[in-house]
C-alpha cells in the first residue's frame, strides 16, 4: 500500500481509559504505519505535554516532516490536542482513535468506538473540515455547558453514576439525586440579549453529548454556527428524552421547556459564578465569551455508507 503521509505522530496518555495502553498502542500501529512512512509514538506524561509537543512541531524542533497527527484517548485527551493545534495554528489533519469513556466527536466522524477498528478505518478515511468553539482562550470541538451538566461531570469524576450516560436514572430521580442548582444568567448571542433563571445552559457544536445524539435535526459542526439551549425548570420533566434519540421528540418542535438560540458569538455571565464544562473538562468559571471559528480544523472522517 502506498503511504499517504510522510511522518505521523501518535499521541497517548498512560491513563487513556484503555485497560492495557501498551497493548492498545500495538493494536493501532499496524494500520497507522501502513499509511505513514514514519510513525512516531509519543507518550504524554503530564497535562499540557501535548500542547508543548504541538509547539515543537510548529517550530520544526520535533521533526521537520510531520504531516499528520493521531490521538488515542478520551474526550479530555482529544481536547488537549485540539488546543495544541489551534493555539499553534498547525494546519495538519488529525485522526482520532477512541480510548476513553465517551468519544462524542468520533460518532460525528463515523469512527468505530473500538480503537483497533478505528485505526483500520484511518486507512481509507478522508479529511473533513470542521468548526471549532473558542471559549475565552481555550478551544473545544463539541460543547460548552454549565449547571446540571457540570454536576453530572463531577459525579463521573467522583466515580458516581453518570446521570446522562445512564438514562434510566434521569427523570423521576433527577431532582432528588442532583437537586439542580438554579442560577441567574445574562446571555448575549449575536448582540441579542436574554436573561432569567435556569438550571442548565448548553452551547453545542457537535450533535453528540454524553454518548447520545441531541434530538435536533439540523445541528452540524460544519455550518459556522453554535446552538445554545436554555433549560427552564419545567423542562426537567422531559429529561428522559434529552440525551436520547426518540422518534417522538425533536428539539426543533419544542417551545416549552427548552429555548434554542443559534448564533456565532456568545457572552455569558451568571450569578453566582458557575463552573463550566468544556468537552468533559471543568477548567473555567463564568463569565465566559464563546465564538465559533468556522472551518478551523481538519479531522479524518469515515464516509457514511
Curated annotation (Swiss-Prot):
GO cellular component terms given for this protein: plasma membrane
Keyword match Transferase: yes
PROSITE patterns in the cross-refs: DAGK
UniProt-annotated binding residues for ATP: 44, 74-80, 101
Residues binding Mg(2+): 220, 223, 225
InterPro entries recorded: ATP-NAD_kinase_N, Diacylglycerol/lipid_kinase, Diacylglycerol_kinase_cat_dom, Lipid_Phosphate_FormReg, NAD/diacylglycerol_kinase_sf, YegS/DAGK_C
GO terms assigned for molecular function: ATP binding; ATP-dependent diacylglycerol kinase activity; metal ion binding
EC number: 2.7.1.-
Highest taxon above the source species: Bacteria
Free-text comment on the cofactor: Binds 1 Mg(2+) ion per subunit. This ion appears to have a structural role and is required for catalytic activity.
GO BP, one annotated term: phospholipid biosynthetic process
Active site: 281 (proton acceptor)
Record's keyword annotation contains Magnesium: yes
Residues of the DAGKc domain: 3-139
Required co-factors: Mg(2+)
The entry's keywords: ATP-binding, Kinase, Lipid biosynthesis, Lipid metabolism, Magnesium, Metal-binding, Nucleotide-binding, Phospholipid biosynthesis, Phospholipid metabolism, Transferase
Matching NCBIfam families: YegS/Rv2252/BmrU family lipid kinase
Membership in a protein family: Belongs to the diacylglycerol/lipid kinase family.
General function of this protein: May catalyze the ATP-dependent phosphorylation of lipids other than diacylglycerol (DAG).
Protein name as annotated: Putative lipid kinase SAB0675c
Amino acid at each position: 500500500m502506498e503511504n499517504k503521509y510522510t511522518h505521523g505522530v501518535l499521541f497517548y496518555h498512560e491513563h487513556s481509559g484503555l485497560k492495557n495502553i501498551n497493548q492498545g498502542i500495538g493494536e493501532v500501529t499496524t494500520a497507522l504505519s501502513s499509511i505513514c512512512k514514519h510513525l512516531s509514538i509519543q507518550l504524554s506524561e503530564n497535562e499540557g505535554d501535548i500542547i508543548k509537543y504541538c509547539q515543537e512541531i510548529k517550530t520544526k524542533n520535533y521533526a521537520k516532516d510531520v504531516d499528520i497527527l493521531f490521538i488515542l484517548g478520551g474526550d479530555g485527551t482529544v481536547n488537549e490536542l485540539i488546543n495544541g493545534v489551534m493555539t499553534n495554528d498547525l494546519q495538519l489533519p488529525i485522526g482520532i482513535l477512541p480510548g476513553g469513556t465517551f468519544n462524542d466527536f468520533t460518532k460525528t466522524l463515523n469512527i468505530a468506538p473500538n480503537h483497533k477498528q478505528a485505526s483500520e478505518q484511518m486507512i481509507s478515511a478522508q479529511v473533513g473540515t470542521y468548526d471549532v468553539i473558542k471559549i475565552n482562550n481555550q478551544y473545544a470541538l463539541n460543547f460548552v455547558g454549565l449547571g446540571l451538566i457540570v454536576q453530572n461531570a463531577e459525579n463521573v469524576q467522583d466515580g458516581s453514576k453518570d446521570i446522562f450516560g445512564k438514562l434510566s436514572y434521569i427523570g423521576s430521580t433527577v431532582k432528588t439525586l442532583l437537586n439542580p442548582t438554579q442560577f441567574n444568567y445574562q446571555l448575549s448571542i449575536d448582540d441579542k440579549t436574554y436573561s432569567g433563571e435556569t438550571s442548565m445552559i448548553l452551547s453545542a457544536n457537535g450533535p453528540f453529548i454524553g454518548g447520545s445524539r441531541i434530538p435536533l435535526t439540523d445541528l452540524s459542526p460544519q455550518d459556522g454556527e453554535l446552538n445554545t439551549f436554555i433549560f427552564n425548570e419545567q423542562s426537567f420533566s422531559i429529561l428522559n428524552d434529552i440525551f436520547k434519540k426518540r422518534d417522538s421528540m425533536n428539539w426543533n418542535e419544542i417551545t416549552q421547556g427548552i429555548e434554542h438560540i443559534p448564533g456565532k458569538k456568545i457572552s455569558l455571565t451568571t450569578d453566582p459564578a458557575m463552573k463550566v464544562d468544556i468537552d468533559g473538562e471543568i477548567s473555567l468559571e463564568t463569565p465566559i465569551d464563546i465564538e465559533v471559528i468556522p472551518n478551523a480544523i481538519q479531522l479524518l472522517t469515515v464516509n457514511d455508507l
